[in-house]
Amino acid sequence: MKKITGIVKLQLPAGKATPAPPVGPALGQYGANIMEFTKAFNAQTADKGDAIIPVEITIFADRSFTFITKTPPMSYLIRKAAGLSKGSATPNKAKVGKLNWEQVLEIAKTKMPDLNAGSLEAAANTVAGTARSMGVTIEGAPNA
């Protein structure tokens, strides 16, 4: 077991990581090979379009590293499905978009590996709650 010197969590655009900030300074302070990471990350996420991908990089004492990519943030998936550039500044007053229940289930399926929900139904309710907090109304929800 190699000794871990640091764990860095970043959110990067898929296939477009560069050694510039935030990647360079975050990895540079641990002495990890920045170019090696950006090449590996870009190769692994090239098929994800322009999504923002959270990544957790574990850096070891010998300056080697491993990284785990996660699914895009829920807010990004909701904005994309509803066709929004950003959520509502006042979600309880101003509604900025609509999602139907099928879209909510689709987002829940995408996020399922990263959620601690026991079922797709529970994951869908989590997605619906996040959408409501962004000022997006949900249509056709079974329990709404």
UniProtKB/Swiss-Prot annotation:
A cellular-component GO term for this protein: cytosolic large ribosomal subunit
GO-annotated molecular function: large ribosomal subunit rRNA binding; structural constituent of ribosome
Maturation and modification: One or more lysine residues are methylated.
GO BP annotations listed: translation
InterPro entries recorded: Ribosomal_uL11, Ribosomal_uL11_bac-typ, Ribosomal_uL11_C, Ribosomal_uL11_C_sf, Ribosomal_uL11_CS, Ribosomal_uL11_N, Ribosomal_uL11_N_sf
Keyword field: Methylation, Ribonucleoprotein, Ribosomal protein, RNA-binding, rRNA-binding
PROSITE patterns linked to this entry: RIBOSOMAL_L11 (PS00359)
Matching Pfam families: Ribosomal_L11, Ribosomal_L11_N
UniProt keyword Ribosomal protein, yes or no: yes
Subunit relationships: Part of the ribosomal stalk of the 50S ribosomal subunit. Interacts with L10 and the large rRNA to form the base of the stalk. L10 forms an elongated spine to which L12 dimers bind in a sequential fashion forming a multimeric L10(L12)X complex.
Family of the protein in this entry: Belongs to the universal ribosomal protein uL11 family.
Function: Forms part of the ribosomal stalk which helps the ribosome interact with GTP-bound translation factors.
The protein's name: Large ribosomal subunit protein uL11
